[in-house]
Amino acid sequence: MKDILKIILDILYPGKCPVCHKIPENTENMICKSCWSRLDFVGKNYCMKCGKPVLLEEEYCEECGRRRRNFTQGRSLLIYNETMKASMIRFKYGGRRQYGDFYARLICMFGKKQILEWNPDLILPVPLHRRKKLARGFNQAEYLAKKIGKELGIPVVSHVLKKVKNTRSQKKLDAEKRRKNLRNAFAANEDFTGLKILIIDDVYTTGSTMDEIALVLKGKGAEKVYFFTICTGYN
């Protein structure tokens, strides 16, 4: 019965390509063949700490090279270029949940090996403040996390990490202002003693969000805090 319902829904409401937002030639692939070539994957040369692209001879990006990180390690799948910026805006603010289906599948395809090497006990999504979640209708990181957790068999917990401070937008803030903006913005109400935790989000920029979350989780006993995101900015 569920399979029949899915077929009917796919016919009535076919999924849209996350890049051009048109119906793909093959809806099972979830992306147009021509749009696939527009995805700019992070290559083999990346920061050993945060996963940002770096030059061949560099081990760390500029930011990770000059300051200590609270998180253990992180990786991202794609470069945050103009194509991905438009896709992420539609995903987050346009309620395009089907984009999350595609990106979660992509992370599981290309990031599975790394995630399983980290061997996390739990997956936590980056939380939204309740006002922002109400305005958007959903938390894109939570949607991604649940899809990834289900595929990889890792428990996902959404209610233990909260955004308690309704911070202003980070878009136009530099790294230092982002850190100040996020100070004391998150809180956790569980004990994570000895646990390895994987944080899921859509975009990694300066690392301020991941650092602040890792600080909170380690304060609650977490042994290691990793992250995986769809996109990352340039070094």
Located regions from the model:
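Glycine-rich phosphate/pyrophosphate-handling loop used in enzymes and phosphotransfer proteins
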Residues: M1-I200, T205-N235
